[in-house]
Amino acid sequence: MEMTHAQRLILSNQYKMMTLLDPENGERYRRLQTIIERGYGLQMRELDRDFGELSEETCRTVIDIMEMYHALQVSRSNMKEGQSIDERRVTFLGFDAATEARFLGYVRFLVNTEGRYTHFDAGTHGFNAQTPMWEKYQRMLKVWQACPRQYHLCANEIMQIINA
């Protein structure tokens, strides 16, 4: 992250204020302030993670994934007696915090800030699947989008989607 001296001074002052406003995270802010003031290039790259960017297309794909899971859950709940699919199979797990943090952050934003998909269980890890899920979800989306009645799936269609 390239910054002018003026930008670094402004950001340093912001971290100083945040230390006063949020003492619980004061140590983190003081560390970031030191990095900015001294211009430690390697550590300044950490700031890039705080200012990520998701394209509109990627955001729509994440929403499509969550909508697919909503459809799976609705379809499962509408199934007749005798047809059973384990609820855990249609539970949205989220994304891997280590490798898919941008997607995970967007999911948390949608649920916690925007109030969407609040019926999804965040679990104890807050939608951190702890394993990469993007490719799996892409395969599932292709199967789901090919279904003629996406919100009235039969047991066979549900199984095809979750096994994709």
UniProtKB/Swiss-Prot annotation:
Family per record: Belongs to the UPF0304 family.
InterPro entries from the UniProt entry: UPF0304_YfbU, YfbU_alpha-helical_sf, YfbU_helix-hairpin_sf
Classification via HAMAP family: UPF0304
Protein name as it appears in the record: UPF0304 protein ESA_00925
Pfam family, one: YfbU
Taxon lineage: Bacteria, Pseudomonadati, Pseudomonadota, Gammaproteobacteria, Enterobacterales
